[in-house]
């Protein structure tokens, strides 16, 4: 990112320059060539130190058509991630498969000395996430999870405000988001491919926004709820290129709404809710309450990776309760959040830096999602137990 400063009172947002490459070119492969891979390809194509040399997809001809559509030549194509990794000398891979197939290719890549940029959600279950983390630790390679909101300057401002101490001790957080109608198609809505629904697709973003801001405290207990009232109803479903509304309603086997009450280490309460569909425009703004001040962050429909509008800081000035508006900050260039997500991963590979979005943090995110699912199924609060890595 280009250098620059945005100032709000005592808070200054700084943008660091991208790390300069030393002339080394990275050989990159793509695993899974569905729609999310499009954002990866568009990002890689803007970089002059990357060669896209291989692509793997289970569907015959899909990877070839994908690369042709994006004008990428000289690519070797494979029917599986194993064949691609075994036959190519890759520096890194983007894993863009459907959710239930995140863990297996990630582990295989790490075990074979390849750095990994893995699309969110991390995995479907906590057990899978733990297995991936152990493979990462053993490999010594970089594994970064694809949370592009991390590079948004407004998200960074939230963290900066919390870390400044302006809010005091954080004791309560409300977060979430969603859409009145916004159920996705294809592999998202079936348990065999999506694994989890709105909870994993967009809920992981809402969790990361606040957990990253407060330093990712360990989750202790969770009481969760999830439902599928809209996804299984033809009246609130929608067709796609391959299925009618009735067919999509029959196929739907994940959650379209989830809510939870989570206790975090440090005596912090997290009140969470997320939806692909609901009969209201928002489940509520994100609220971070501290002993000195509070911060309100307008909710979004979880499409664009930033905040929903001007934030408000509630604090006392000379003993007088005061509301201070925090204007939306403009990101420093027009390359987009996805580009900077990919670039930060490659910079880590080139310069031997830590993963931009480390699994040590997202493991806690996944533990909460896993706990919500398990609690919803059994109908009562559960302890969250995270195995040693």
Give each language-model segment a name.
Residues 51-54, 326-330, 347-365:
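Glycine- and charged-residue-rich phosphate/anionic-cofactor binding loop of Rossmann-like
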Residues 79, 118, 143-145, 174, ...:
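Hydrophobic residues in well-ordered beta-strands that form the structural core
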């Amino acid at each position: 990112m280009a250098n620059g400063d945005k100032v709000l009172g005592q808070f200054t947002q700084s943008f660091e320059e991208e790390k300069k490459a030393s002339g080394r070119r990275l050989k990159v492969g793509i695993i899974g060539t569905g729609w999310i891979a499009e954002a990866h390809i568009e990002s890689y194509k803007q970089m002059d130190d990357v060669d896209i040399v291989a692509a793997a997809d289970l569907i015959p001809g899909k990877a070839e058509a994908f690369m042709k559509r994006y004008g990428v030549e000289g690519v070797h194509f494979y029917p599986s991630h194993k064949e691609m990794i075994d036959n190519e000398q890759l520096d890194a891979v983007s894993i863009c498969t459907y959710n239930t197939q995140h863990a297996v290719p990630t582990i295989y890549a790490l075990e074979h000395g390849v750095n990994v940029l893995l699309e969110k959600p991390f995995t479907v279950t906590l057990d899978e996430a733990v297995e991936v983390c152990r493979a990462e630790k053993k490999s010594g390679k970089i594994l970064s999870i694809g949370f592009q909101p991390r590079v948004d300057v407004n998200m960074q401002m939230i963290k900066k405000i919390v870390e400044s101490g302006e809010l005091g001790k954080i004791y309560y957080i409300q977060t979430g988001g969603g859409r009145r109608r916004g159920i996705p198609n294809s592999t998202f809505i079936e348990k065999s491919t999506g694994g989890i629904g709105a909870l994993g697709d967009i809920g992981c973003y809402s969790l990361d926004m606040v957990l990253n801001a407060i330093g990712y405290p360990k989750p202790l207990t969770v009481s969760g709820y999830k439902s599928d009232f809209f996804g299984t109803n033809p009246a609130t479903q929608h067709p796609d290129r391959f299925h009618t509304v009735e067919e999509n309603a029959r196929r739907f086997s994940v959650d379209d709404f989830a809510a939870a009450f989570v206790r975090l280490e440090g005596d912090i309460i997290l009140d969470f809710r997320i939806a692909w569909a609901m009969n209201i425009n928002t489940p509520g703004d994100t609220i971070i309450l501290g002993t000195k001040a509070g911060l309100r962050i307008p909710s979004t429909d979880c499409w664009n990776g930033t905040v929903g509008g001007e934030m408000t800081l509630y604090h006392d000035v000379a003993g007088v309760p005061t509301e201070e508006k925090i204007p939306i900050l403009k990101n420093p260039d027009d390359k987009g959040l996805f580009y900077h997500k990919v670039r930060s991963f490659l910079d880590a590979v080139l310069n031997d830096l830590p993963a931009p979005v480390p699994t040590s943090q997202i493991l806690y995110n996944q533990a909460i999602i896993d706990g919500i699912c398990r609690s919803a199924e059994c109908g009562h609060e559960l302890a969250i137990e995270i195995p040693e890595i």
